[in-house]
Each structure stands twice: as C-alpha cells, then as structure tokens.
C-alpha cells in the first residue's frame, strides 16, 4: 500500500516540530565566553535548522550554533564565528555575526513570502538541452529571474553531441538571439567533454548556481566538474514523505570545484519560479525592452496589441526578436494563471 501524501498543513506541522526539536537540542549546548576562541572569518557551507556548518580559513568544517540575534543565515553567507575549546554534543562553535550580502537568491513560498536560500552568488548557470526540445521559454524565464535578482547569467546548452550539422547550425542561429543581447552562451556536452574546459574557466573564482529543468543534465555536468564523491550527493532523490529528506539532499550546500570556484546546490536552488513577480518586473527582465519603456502612448500599455505601443513597434522594425516577444506574453499569462490559484504576501522589510 502506498503512503498517503501529506497535506500542505501537515507538512508545515512536521517542519515546525522538526525545528522545535532542533531548537530544543540547541538549548542543551550553552557556551561560556571563556570556552570560546577569538572571533574569526568563515563561510556557511550548509544550514540545518538552528545549526550551520562553517568552513574556517584552514578549510576545516565546524558544526556551529547560531546566535539567536541572527535572523537570517543561508548557505554562502560570510560570517564571524568562534570555535569552542571542545566539542559539546557535536557542536564545536557558534556563529556570532553575518557580513552584508553582495547578492541573495530568494524563492517564493506560498505561506511565508520570499525566503532566502543562498547568498553571495556571482552567477546563475542556466542549463538547457536540445532534447527532448530546446525551450527558449524556460531560458527566458531564468533570464528574467537573473535580471530581477541582479545576478549575472550564463546560458549553457548541453547535449550538443546529439546534433547533426544541420541541427547545430539551427541552434547556433537561435542562440545568436541571446548573444546579440550580450548574454554569454556556451555550447557543450558532458558526454564528450566538449566545452567543459570553457565552462571551468567561466566558473573559476566565482560562486555559481546551476538552474534548469529536470532532465537537461545539470547533475551530469556537476559530476564532470566536481570530485566524484561530492558530486554523487547531487543526484540523490528526496524520498521523505514530509519533503524534509536528509540533510545531504535537501539543504543547500556549497561545494568547491577542484579547478577553482564554488557552486551552491540543492533541489530547491535548481528550480525557482516567477509567480511572485509583478508584470512590471517581468517587463524589465527583458533587457531589450528597457529602452522603449515610458515611450508607449498609454501608461497602462500591455505591450501587446495596444495602439501606440513602443515595444511592438520595435518588434515590427526587427529590433526585438519575435521569440522573445512571444515568450514575454507566455510568461505573463502563466503567472496570471498561477496567481489565481495561490495566495502570496511578501515579507515586511
């Protein structure tokens, strides 16, 4: 007999009980100031409830408590922490402060608004593939997210080894749409290793996120780039009915590439939606539209069949790609459909 799927309310209660257990466990470890070393810098490798794994400057990991005055702490945060003179109940230090973030990746939550899930990201690697079909709509969705978050994108088209010469020429022509907008595009194959060296160079010295739909080869790419033992963690599935799973599969985690650079990965990081955005944010997310904003005849122009629309006029002059224009309206339509089914409220600032 299959397990009964938990409702949203039941999942939230399971999560709340889990957090209370972690908080209770945390209260068992009380650090006296005399037991702590001098403050030092660190990076959050992963966060587990009231605890976090901190990487010290020497590369060693320390499971730490988190000061109750710290209200937001995610993977990638740069912190000040203090090591304990001894390990107590598996805890070897405490996080005392968080440095200001250069960037933060957020995910819309149906109940809690925008939730930060990773910090200090330099680029989002948008992984797409030519099979079962090349979806420009998905690429454009992620580009809108990148523009809204103000994080630089890198488009990686995987599985190009499956293309013949004619197919390759067609895909190159399609990708020229994005190159013309000054987006970086990389064609590669994790199977033949074509383009892997170029991708390694693009990742070196940066903190990256890999994003894309299931089946496009994200895990295969990461397996090709990371140490095998680390990469194996990335392909595990979450089987826990509560959706919490194990720490190694559900918590966002930072990995180091052997060639240099880092990646933050988790199932929640790889896929994130746009339904929480306002239409105006989506419009600005199409960077080629920006020069025409404010030039339409009507202030409430929907940039479709409205008379005097500057964006449609640019489309008709060939200054905007029809594929991008069509995807813009598809995104708005899908967002409107989702918002009729979900309720969303942004958190107070």
From Swiss-Prot:
Binding-site residues for GTP, renumbered to this chain? 158-161, 212-220
Per the record, the major location class is: cytoplasm
Name any one GO molecular function.
Answer: GTP binding
Q: What are the record keywords, sorted?
A: Cytoplasm, GTP-binding, Hydrolase, Metal-binding, Nucleotide-binding, Ribosome biogenesis, RNA-binding, rRNA-binding, Zinc
Q: What is its EC number?
A: 3.6.1.-
Q: Which residues bind Zn(2+)?
A: 296, 301, 303, 309
> PROSITE patterns from the xrefs?
ENGC_GTPASE, G_CP
Q: Which domain of life is it from?
A: Bacteria
Key word Repressor present: no
Question: Mind telling me which InterPro entries this protein's record contains?
Answer: G_CP_dom, NA-bd_OB-fold, P-loop_NTPase, Ribosome_biogen_GTPase_RsgA, RsgA_GTPase_dom
Instruction: Report the enzyme's class at the first EC level.
Output: hydrolase
In terms of SUPFAM superfamilies, this protein maps to: P-loop containing nucleoside triphosphate hydrolases (SSF52540)
One GO cellular component assignment for this chain's record is: cytoplasm
Q: What does this protein do?
A: One of several proteins that assist in the late maturation steps of the functional core of the 30S ribosomal subunit. Helps release RbfA from mature subunits. May play a role in the assembly of ribosomal proteins into the subunit. Circularly permuted GTPase that catalyzes slow GTP hydrolysis, GTPase activity is stimulated by the 30S ribosomal subunit.
Query: Which HAMAP family does the entry mention?
Result: GTPase_RsgA
UniProt lists the family membership as follows:
Belongs to the TRAFAC class YlqF/YawG GTPase family. RsgA subfamily.
Q: How does it assemble?
A: Monomer. Associates with 30S ribosomal subunit, binds 16S rRNA.
Q: What is this protein called?
A: Small ribosomal subunit biogenesis GTPase RsgA
Q: What is the organism of origin for this protein?
A: Dickeya dadantii (strain 3937) (Erwinia chrysanthemi (strain 3937))
Source lineage? Bacteria, Pseudomonadati, Pseudomonadota, Gammaproteobacteria, Enterobacterales
The gene coding this protein: rsgA
